[in-house]
Amino acid sequence: MPIGVPKVPFRSPGDEDASWVDVINRLYRERLLFLGQEVDSEISNQLIGLMVFLSIEDDTKDLYLFINSPGGWVIPGLGIYDTMQFVQPDVQTICMGLAASMGSFILVGGEITKRLAFPHARVMIHQPASSFYEAQTGEFILEAEELLKLRETITRVYVQRTGKSLWVISEDMERDVFMSATEAQAHGLVDLVAVE
């Protein structure tokens, strides 16, 4: 029998008694956000809403985005990335487990000098993909053009945020490139590796 989402006590400033809230809600109140699934429109909208709300609530305290994601949809991922750049507080990104594909793109979008990977984390970058086999010929051409534009955008961001050359990033994105935490640090995807 499932136990559901664990509840923890939370006391608002000025309240005498604590109320019980689910653990994720409690962590959000501490500005700790989680991307622990494939990136899709639903999780993207939730994270965007939380970042905007927490930014309005206090624009001086950093946000912490913990990432354990196999990647996912490109456009919702770009929405998360753009919001991270838009909100006033710095967004610190922490890779735990895996940040692959769009997960690594969001990871690299954290505030430079505040991007961290746990020691056994893995990071993977590659080019965006599409399901061409489902499209008609005309749609196929349009989709290929859009995919090339998205690849250029993603490549430019990696170049800007890693300090690596366009040639190096373009070469790496030709195939799935998996990296350890220290390799990701050497590649400029993260700034720090947590110690064991």
UniProtKB/Swiss-Prot annotation:
Compartment annotation: Plastid, Chloroplast stroma
InterPro entries per record: ClpP, ClpP/crotonase-like_dom_sf, ClpP/TepA, ClpP_His_AS, ClpP_Ser_AS
Enzyme class: hydrolase
Molecular function GO labels: ATP-dependent peptidase activity; ATPase binding; serine-type endopeptidase activity
EC number: 3.4.21.92
Family the entry assigns: Belongs to the peptidase S14 family.
Complex formation: Component of the chloroplastic Clp protease core complex.
HAMAP family for this protein: ClpP
Name recorded for this polypeptide: ATP-dependent Clp protease proteolytic subunit
Organism: Morus indica (Mulberry)
